[in-house]
UniProtKB/Swiss-Prot annotation:
EC top class, as a word: lyase
Gene3D superfamilies membership: Imidazole glycerol phosphate dehydratase, domain 1
Claim: Amino-acid biosynthesis is one of the keywords in the record: yes
Encoding gene (name): hisB
CDD domains per the UniProt record, alphabetical: IGPD
Gene Ontology CC terms, in alphabetical order: cytoplasm
Keyword Flavoprotein applies: no
Protein's name in the database: Imidazoleglycerol-phosphate dehydratase
EC numbers on record: 4.2.1.19
Record GO biological process: L-histidine biosynthetic process
Main subcellular location of this protein, as a coarse class: cytoplasm
Keywords: Amino-acid biosynthesis, Cytoplasm, Histidine biosynthesis, Lyase
Family: Belongs to the imidazoleglycerol-phosphate dehydratase family.
Pathway annotation from the record: Amino-acid biosynthesis; L-histidine biosynthesis; L-histidine from 5-phospho-alpha-D-ribose 1-diphosphate: step 6/9
Amino acid sequence: MTEPNRVAEVRRDTAETKIRVRVDLDGTGVARLATGIGFFDHMLDQLARHGLVDLEIEADGDLHIDGHHTVEDVGITLGQAFAKAVGDKKGLRRYGHAYVPLDEALSRVVVDFSGRPGLHMRVPFKAGMIGALDTQLVYEFFQGFVNHAGVTLHIDNLHGDNAHHQCETVFKAFARALRMALERDPRMAGVIPSTKGSL
């Protein structure tokens, strides 16, 4: 029996931003990204490559003010796209976790496609800006994603002296955790991974 494609496209159009996101959860890590914030694109590329998710993101935001609306709204729209692509969650492994190092930095991410949004993030960034990305906005991105994907997400940077390294380990670990959680479990085919019978 052929598994259904897990592909979704979502658009978000507000007075502040215009966003288009397309995801293929069973991709090969191909990314086409244009958010207007170079380092943010770099992090989203890590998400695609290490999560093996094909990802297209186009964002036209009010960057003349700052990056807040753009980064947050990309998180919201990406979360909506993931939720749409995942569907009823039948056969999903559901849980994923990963530790990822980069030189002195080490981060751990744990995700649960629980249907219950919750973000617990502890990342003491060593700098306020990485390129054109305000590090405070990393939290806003993940909060937007969590609320609209319906996941519980724990993010901990365990070590790190360089903000670029800290951020990169967070996004790579997030990608690897997603990849694990989104895998289809052949022993759970057609079954929702919860004793409640729904997520």
